[in-house]
């Protein structure tokens, strides 16, 4: 005997699944539900349990049939007539019961009447059961009419396959199968599921019912096209073709980024720009040895980071331009850290080799400190010595770009709907919203309905980097398009859809979703919730950006932070530099989900605004041990700060007055917030904290005041400090107690 499930056995025995489960529990056989599998020996035991009942039932049925057969000749008996519900018979029985003298005559009349009524009753019951029989009277005609549609329903064929999305109600499933809802409810009951006609069925229940009917089931999975950034379309390997590499040129100011690109393109980009410094993101394509290379000329590295922060990698190769006569500069280090954080291969271009003071070996030596070791010195970083001015070494650089792109095996499918990224966007007076797009897969054509970020439209016109109109753009090709309803942001993703109606729906839905996201609180890593994230397994490494007042402090702080050892989490310093905390640091922290540590330095106004909008955690300290203790305590889950610093105002020192026995009086103008008499202050000079202390006196004209608001002038002295100079910034702050959650 083969195995079978509980519900199959219940169906075989024509009993509910719950009854079988109850029997099994009485036999000390544990089953969880009606889907449990029964072994052959268990099935045999169950058969023994159910067999005696079956025999008894058959015996009782046979006895009843025999009784009926023997009762047939005894039709005149009055006891039998009492079983029928005919009014006339009951009347006759009553009449027969009343007269005691005429009992025999009553019995004779009763016998004749009951014989006729019994025959009529049996004919009526037979017609009711079988849907047949003589159509005598109105009572017999009604059931025959009701049974007419039944044969038609049985003849209806079952579908070979049904599809559903999410779930189905009992009524919907019955309609798809072409069956009555009551039949489906009965089957569910046999499976141990109590359901009503409007009850939703899960996937398992739908599959069980359909398998019982021998119908194939297919579930439709809906894709949220509004979140098309998350949709990755897997292309077949045979559809992929080689695409041009996308190259970003990065480096320090005036090290020759735009001049290098100009030399490669044989155009005069630099002359068109104010002061020879790039003012916007440009995307250009050049041809080398019958192969194309796409260059992005970014203003420093802010746009590069912004695009990465938006969750999409655009650049394939980074060219790090370093002047041979200047060496590694702060922005060079920032560019290295940005490229490494994005896991993009770096090619170092040592520029200005035509200058007599050029020293490429010094540059190579300095870059070794940042793990960029030249190939000739046993490393894996490609170094190209060149001069953008004389065009010496350019061919070697371009060959190296093509070599790295071959190593990276950059491929894309051109035969699909286009997707890509916005490089630049602006509002043109004559043409309306204009966007420079970089196609990353597929082919963009004129007339395509398109969704770009949170806006939408139809591609009205396309212009390539040479200013010529084109009808289509393939992978890695930059084009400027018109036809959008609004100006998108640099770094936004775009996707082409089949029709403009759908593009509009998705564009509006994305705009609505962005509005909701802006209202909700963004979750960024902060020391306050760091331990919770570590505990939940969300954090494997803690990214830090370290800024300090002097190089010695930077090195000491980095060394101390890297020694912190907490099980399961490691500290990763993604950027360390000297100077005030800038907006660029906040951009990098946003892209890398990092915490900014400031040691003896302060964030500037733009950095503060960016940190507030992006919810980046900035920690400011003056004692190195406090930094280490705070980070270590946060990682171990012991961080419990009771007080939080709140900056209430800033004042700029416009003039100083030295008064004997008083000290230096600072004539100040309150630029932000307010300065209060009881607040603590710190003196900031060129972004570096010089002194922290308390206000000794605060006056307006000759009157002592409790506070001075924004836009007013005042005079103040700092307790035990007189080295105040014009141009210094006095920052007032208070310590507020924070209620811990």
Curated annotation (Swiss-Prot):
Gene3D superfamilies: 1.10.10.2480, P-loop containing nucleotide triphosphate hydrolases (3.40.50.300), Translation factors (2.40.30.10), Translation initiation factor IF- 2, domain 3 (3.40.50.10050). Residues 48-158 are annotated as: Disordered. Keywords: Cytoplasm, GTP-binding, Initiation factor, Nucleotide-binding, Protein biosynthesis. Residues 251-258 are annotated as: G1. Residues 127-139 have a biased composition (Basic residues). Residues 276-280 are annotated as: G2. The keyword Disulfide bond does not apply. Residues 48-74, 107-123 have a biased composition (Basic and acidic residues). It comes from the Bacteria. The keyword Nucleotide-binding applies. GTP binds at residues 251-258, 297-301, 351-354. InterPro entries: EF-G-like_DII (IPR053905), EFTu-like_2 (IPR004161), IF2_II (IPR044145), IF2_N (IPR006847), P-loop_NTPase (IPR027417), Small_GTP-bd (IPR005225), T_Tr_GTP-bd_dom (IPR000795), TF_IF2_bacterial-like (IPR000178). Its main location: cytoplasm. Residues 242-411 form the tr-type G domain. CDD domains: IF2_eIF5B, IF2_mtIF2_II, mtIF2_IVc. Residues 351-354 are annotated as: G4. Residues 297-300 are annotated as: G3. Residues 140-151 have a biased composition (Low complexity). Residues 387-389 are annotated as: G5. One of its GO terms (cellular component) is cytosol. It is found in: Cytoplasm. GO terms for molecular function: GTP binding; GTPase activity; translation initiation factor activity. One of the essential components for the initiation of protein synthesis. Protects formylmethionyl-tRNA from spontaneous hydrolysis and promotes its binding to the 30S ribosomal subunits. Also involved in the hydrolysis of GTP during the formation of the 70S ribosomal complex. Belongs to the TRAFAC class translation factor GTPase superfamily. Classic translation factor GTPase family. IF-2 subfamily. This is Translation initiation factor IF-2. It comes from Geobacillus stearothermophilus (Bacillus stearothermophilus).
